[in-house]
Amino acid sequence: MNKPIIALDFQTYEEVETFLAKFSGETLSVKVGMELFYSNGPVIVEKIKQQNHEIFLDLKLHDIPNTVKSAMIGLAKLGVDMVNVHAAGGKKMMEAAKEGLEIGSPSGKRPKIIAVTQLTSTSETDMQTEQLIKTSLLESVMHYSNLSKQAGLDGVVCSALEAEDIKQQNGADFLRVTPGIRLASDTADDQIRVVTPEKARLIGSSNIVVGRSITRANDPVAAYNQVLKEWNA
């Protein structure tokens, strides 16, 4: 999934269909998150796959290892390209998640699996006062990244601001998938650690996830092409 990943932050397939129709003939990388998946079920993935788009299924699993393993067996059968868990679930949970994907993958080739470190809506103060993690935000992200690597995962979800440090610690092949991407003309909304596609490329992101800058644009195709231009420059 080398192209910018478009976050399909919609509730209905009709909205998705209308949006994707604007990109007729183009193969996209898209993110199906909780809102869309929980509103429509697995059929939403099947319909998008029928259009040959790559899918990052963003459900952020976080439960006991056996439950996550069983859930991943089911998700693997959907044929998506990437899934994720919360690194806070621990090393054993992440190992179980990967094992579940390997068991459930019908073709023998499992989806990529990455772990969420800290949400891009979380500030250092939030983390320290609400999660009672007394390190710096960067130290927390780096710890979770290292734990994910030890568990055999393919990478992490992180802010672009931490991407270069993770690349140095865990290697260039370890994915650094970064949400919180906005075009310079857009607002940050509810995300705290936000950068442009160009800056994300320059400071070490391996993949970017872009939602509102594209889906809420007056001309989504033009906005996507602008993101693509900055990302590939």
Swiss-Prot record:
Family of the protein in this entry: Belongs to the OMP decarboxylase family. Type 1 subfamily.
Organism from which the protein derives: Listeria monocytogenes serovar 1/2a (strain ATCC BAA-679 / EGD-e)
UniProt function note: Catalyzes the decarboxylation of orotidine 5'-monophosphate (OMP) to uridine 5'-monophosphate (UMP).
GO biological process, one term: 'de novo' UMP biosynthetic process
Gene: pyrF
GO molecular function: orotidine-5'-phosphate decarboxylase activity
Key word Lyase present: yes
GO terms under cellular component: cytosol
Source lineage: Bacteria, Bacillati, Bacillota, Bacilli, Bacillales
Name used for this protein in its record: Orotidine 5'-phosphate decarboxylase
E.C. code: 4.1.1.23
